[in-house]
Design a protein with these regions (language model features):
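Substrate-binding pocket helix/loop in short-chain dehydrogenase/reductase
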Residues: 81-82, 89-94, 184
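Active-site helix of classical SDR
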Residues: 105, 141, 149
Length: 230
């Protein structure tokens, strides 16, 4: 997404939690290096820390002088079937995926100048398209994002700010083992995985002036993927 937005002329700030990003061990998973490559502003942040989301928005405003667009694609997700749920894991999902987004949007709204168009793009998942019985805490947190997207869109529309959420579907970022990769691929009608670039194209469009009349929407960018496909 950062590559696409930079290519399309946006001035971009990237953030991440270095300790967590390093644990994931995914290819291309170093946002600081990516920021340096793209000439973007890199500002690490812990969105679970007190004041973390507010400080992140303040850093963007200080660096750029204003903040027009917020793309919030951070997430926390673990395997949480019914028999393995515990309060700590539920709280972690809600803190990262719900509370942090609420505070980011609140801080954005406070910092966004009157009379300037604005864009907020949040990320959800496919929980409304079929059961996610092995990811109960994650599914609950992403369902909250869909609800909040609609409320935020109503609250911010008078100020010219659109708010939408994307369900990117399964993206081939290196996380899936070979068996999972094959199972998921067969459930895409096109028999290929989605890619980060597929999602990035939609993000960039939603951030553009052309999407000024699109708000309060939950948009599936998932290539028709369904667990029911075979």
């Amino acid at each position: 997404m950062a590559r696409r937005l930079t290519t399309d002329g946006y001035r971009v700030m990237l953030t991440g939690l270095p300790s967590y990003d390093a644990e994931q061990g995914l290819p291309g998973g170093d946002p600081a290096a990516l920021a340096a490559e793209l000439g973007a502003f890199w500002h690490p942040a812990d969105l679970t820390a007190p004041g973390g989301p507010e400080a992140l928005v303040a850093a963007a405003v200080e660096h750029f002088g204003a903040l027009d667009t917020l793309v919030s694609c951070h997430t926390y997700s673990t395997h949480t079937p019914l028999g393995e749920l515990d309060s700590a894991e539920i709280d972690r999902h809600l803190t990262v995926n719900v509370r942090a987004n609420m505070l980011l949007v609140q801080a954005y709204a406070a910092a966004h100048g009157e009379g300037r168009p604005g864009r907020i793009v949040l990320f959800t998942s496919g929980q409304r398209l079929g059961p996610m019985t092995g990811e109960l805490a994650y599914a609950a947190s992403k369902a909250a994002i869909e609800y909040l997207t609609r409320d935020f869109s109503v609250l911010l529309a008078p100020r010219g700010v659109t708010v939408n959420a994307i369900n990117p579907g399964p993206n081939d970022t290196g996380w899936a083992d070979p068996e999972t990769h094959a199972w998921v691929r067969e459930r895409f009608p096109a028999k290929r995985w989605g890619t980060p670039d597929d999602t990035a194209k939609l993000v960039s469009w939603l951030c553009s002036a052309e999407a000024g009349w699109i708000t309060g929407q939950i948009i599936d960018s998932a290539g028709g993927w369904s667990r029911d496909n075979a």
